[in-house]
C-alpha cells in the first residue's frame, strides 16, 4: 500500500477521514501480506469513550462533558491531562486484596494457591511438588528426568537426532 492510499478502502484520491465508503471509522486492522499492508474491515461498532454509547465517537458526541477524571474526580479532562498532583494509590495484596503488603508477604498463607500444583497453602516459588515438563510426573525437573524423550530432526524429519547432528546437507 502506498502512502497516498486511503487506509479504509485502499483507493487513492482521499484520506481515511474523508473516505466515502464509510467503512469502520478507523477501526480496521492492517495485516502484513506479501504485497505489504492490506486492509481488513472490522465489524466492531464505534464506541464513544465520553458517553459509552455505540454508533459514534467522542468528537461527534452530543454530551459535552466527559465522565469524571480518574485522578481528581472532576469532568472536562482525563487523568493523563489532569493538572492536580497524581494521586498515590496504595498497592494491594493479590491474595487477600488488602493494602499494606504484597502477596508473597500475606498472612493468609492457607488461602494462597500454588500455580504449579494447584494446592492451597503455598505459592509456586515455595512448591515442593515440582513437575517435569518432559514426562509430566511430579518430584523432578526435566534436566533430571530419567525418561528419554523422542527427539526429531528439523532438517530431515527423522527421529533420534537433532538438526545439528544431522548428516543430511541443509538445503537453501
From Swiss-Prot:
GO terms for biological process: positive regulation of cytoplasmic translation. It comes from the Eukaryota. A zinc finger (CCHC-type) spans 4-21, 46-63, 67-84, 91-108, 112-129, 130-147, 151-168. Gene3D superfamilies: Zinc finger, CCHC-type. Its main location: nucleus. It is found in: Nucleus; Cytoplasm; Endoplasmic reticulum. InterPro entries: Znf_CCHC, Znf_CCHC_sf. The keyword Metal-binding applies. One of its GO terms (molecular function) is single-stranded RNA binding. One of its GO terms (cellular component) is endoplasmic reticulum. Single-stranded DNA-binding protein that preferentially binds to the sterol regulatory element (SRE) sequence 5'-GTGCGGTG-3', and thereby mediates transcriptional repression. Has a role as transactivator of the Myc promoter. Binds single-stranded RNA in a sequence-specific manner. Binds G-rich elements in target mRNA coding sequences. Prevents G-quadruplex structure formation in vitro, suggesting a role in supporting translation by resolving stable structures on mRNAs. PANTHER family: DNA-BINDING PROTEIN. Associates with the 40S ribosomal subunit, the 80S ribosome and with polysomes. This is CCHC-type zinc finger nucleic acid binding protein. The lineage of its organism: Eukaryota, Metazoa, Chordata, Craniata, Vertebrata. The gene is CNBP.
